[in-house]
Each structure stands twice: as C-alpha cells, then as structure tokens.
Amino acid sequence: MKVIIASQNPAKIAAVESAFNLAFPNDTFSFEGVSVKSGVPDQPMSCEETKQGAINRVNNAKIKLPNCDYYVGLEAGIEGNSTFAWMIIDNGLTVGESRSSSLPLPPQVIDEVKKGKELGDVMDEQFNTDNIKQKGGAIGLLTNNLLTRTSVYQQALILALIPFLHPTRF
C-alpha cells in the first residue's frame, strides 16, 4: 500500500513509517514524502490554524499524487505558551485525526515566535543547534531527549489510525 506523507521532514516521515508499521504489522507499505503547501502561515498560531494546515496538506497531496492508499498531513503549531501538532490521515473513505501532546515553551521562545519567527529557528538560535525541526525538535531539546518530535508524533499518528484499525466502528 502506498502512503503519501505531505512533508519531506525526516522526523515526520519516520513517525509516519513507524506508526503505520506498528499499527499494521502484517501489511507492507511504501512511503513517499512530498512537498506541498499548508495554506497557513509558516508558524501557525492557533489550534484551528494548525489543524487546517494539516488538512490542506492532505488535500494538496491528493491533488499532486492521486490514487494512493493513504495520505498523511502533519502540521505543528503554537497556541498560548505551548506547541503541538495535528495529524490527519485520509484513505478516501475515512479520515482519522489526532492532536499530539502539548509542550510548554519557555517565555523567551514564545516572545521570539510572536515576533514572526518559526519555532525551529528560534530553538536553533537559543539552544545553539542546527535544523532541530528536522531532528528531535523542541520536544527533544526541552525533554533532554526523553521524547523526540518523532516519538510524540508517532503516538498521535497511532491515535489517528484508530478508525482504520476498527473500520466497522467508524
């Protein structure tokens, strides 16, 4: 089965691959990351805006690569003093969705993001890292790598897969 991931971010791709392989151990998948627009600002600043970005990514991936088995959109955002991400999974018949855990952000990080900077760039500046958003993310930095962007996204993706695990109930 072909799974299209509406991102080329390695951390997001790894999370999707892991979630699908754990949820469906007897199935064989091929995964492809594609670059598509989210239709929202680079740094979404509300739950609604973030969810819409994930939905838009799925819809744009379906246009770019039609006739695949699953489309997955992941969009990270900020609301208040926390960051989180929305997961949308669509197979053309069913849509599964879930929001990740929320990660509190330090006040100085929030201040910079409110000035229009992307969270990943702010984290790189303040923690002297390089391209953290494609690695462990802010989650990895702030939890001392007890959790990573991939591990938290994997959990949310598994939750979004529930309607596909139990199709007769949804």
From Swiss-Prot:
The keyword Magnesium applies. Its EC number is 3.6.1.73. InterPro entries: ITPase-like_fam (IPR029001), Non_canon_purine_NTPase (IPR002786), NTPase/PRRC1 (IPR026533), YjjX_NTPase (IPR050299). It catalyses: XTP + H2O = XDP + phosphate + H(+); ITP + H2O = IDP + phosphate + H(+). Keywords: Hydrolase, Magnesium, Manganese, Metal-binding, Nucleotide metabolism, Nucleotide-binding. GO terms for molecular function: ITPase activity; metal ion binding; nucleotide binding; ribonucleoside triphosphate phosphatase activity. Its cofactor is Mg(2+); Mn(2+). Pfam families: NTPase_I-T. Coiled coil: none annotated. One of its GO terms (biological process) is nucleotide metabolic process. Binds 1 divalent metal cation per subunit; can use either Mg(2+) or Mn(2+). Homodimer. Belongs to the YjjX NTPase family. NCBIfam families: inosine/xanthosine triphosphatase, PRK05074.1. Phosphatase that hydrolyzes non-canonical purine nucleotides such as XTP and ITP to their respective diphosphate derivatives. Probably excludes non-canonical purines from DNA/RNA precursor pool, thus preventing their incorporation into DNA/RNA and avoiding chromosomal lesions. This is Inosine/xanthosine triphosphatase. It comes from Aliivibrio fischeri (strain MJ11). The lineage of its organism: Bacteria, Pseudomonadati, Pseudomonadota, Gammaproteobacteria, Vibrionales.
